[in-house]
């Protein structure tokens, strides 16, 4: 049985990660032009209210077949390369609020990448909590899906930290109503427990056509399971 935090508990938890800590960081402000492009799209194009909003980092942006792969669902695609939860959180209202939709699907994988400025798994989970709170201010009951961070060859050296962050986010999802964790890990690991190189392009980070085919099947199955009961 899923046990849910009351909203006031969520508010208290996320208060330790204020937006102001990140809003003025140059690496966050650098995405302003990308967000403005999304806003121009929102002005110039209309979307059906039953659409699924896919938002996050480059794996969302580069998903060229997303419209076909997600049929019969209508799709709104809002991905920008290099997104981290620390900047997505700042821009979440501008990305998500314009779109009353059937569900929101998020994939962000760059907060732990083997860099000096990596966040800890706990920090990643706190940023997810804050992002979820921002979404819930506008869309209290809209299903929110978090796609687990993929085990990739290029970031295998930090997989223990990524896996820990995944586990923390999974726990958060299990305790919040209408919030779902899409676990993709086992589909991208071989029988030896290593990432399947054949599912990635040459950078060994982003999915190739076969990788997206697996991703889309998992994600659509989760959407079908949840939304058919709504």
Regions found by a protein language model. Give the residues of each.
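Loop/turn elements at helix/coil->beta-strand transitions in domains of secreted/extracellular proteins
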Residues: 49-51, 73-74, 99-104, 139-143, ...
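Alpha-helix N-cap and loop-to-helix initiation/capping positions
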Residues: 119-127, 157-164
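Catalytic His-Asp segment of secreted/periplasmic serine-dependent ester chemistry enzymes
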Residues: 151-230
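N-terminal secretory targeting modules
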Residues: 1-54, 68, 226-230
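Active-site segments of SGNH/GDSL-like serine hydrolases
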Residues: 107-113, 133-164, 186
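Oxyanion-hole/transition-state-stabilizing segment in secreted/luminal serine hydrolases
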Residues: 60-74, 88-125, 145, 149-153
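Generic structural signal for well-ordered alpha-helices
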Residues: 92, 128-133, 166, 170
């Amino acid at each position: 049985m899923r046990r849910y935090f009351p909203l006031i508990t969520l508010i208290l938890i996320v208060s330790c990660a204020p937006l102001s800590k990140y809003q003025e960081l140059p690496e966050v402000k650098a995405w302003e032009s990308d967000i403005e492009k999304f806003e121009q799209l929102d002005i110039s194009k209309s979307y059906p209210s039953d659409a699924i909003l896919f938002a996050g980092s480059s794996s969302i942006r580069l998903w060229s077949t997303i419209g076909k792969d997600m049929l019969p669902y209508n799709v709104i695609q809002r991905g920008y390369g290099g997104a981290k939860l620390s900047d997505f959180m700042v821009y979440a209202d501008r990305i998500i609020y314009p779109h009353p939709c059937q569900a929101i699907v998020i994939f962000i994988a760059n907060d732990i990448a083997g860099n000096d400025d990596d966040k800890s798994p706990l920090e990643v989970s706190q940023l997810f909590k804050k992002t979820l709170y921002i979404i819930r201010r506008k869309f209290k009951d809209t299903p929110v899906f978090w796609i687990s961070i993929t085990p990739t060859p290029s970031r295998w050296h930090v997989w223990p930290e990524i896996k820990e962050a995944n586990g923390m986010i999974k726990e958060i999802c299990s305790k919040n109503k209408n919030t779902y964790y899409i676990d993709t890990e086992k589909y991208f690991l071989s029988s030896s427990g290593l990432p399947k190189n054949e599912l990635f392009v040459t950078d060994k980070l982003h999915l190739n056509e076969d990788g997206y085919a697996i991703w889309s099947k998992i994600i659509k199955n989760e959407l079908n399971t949840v939304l058919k009961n709504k």
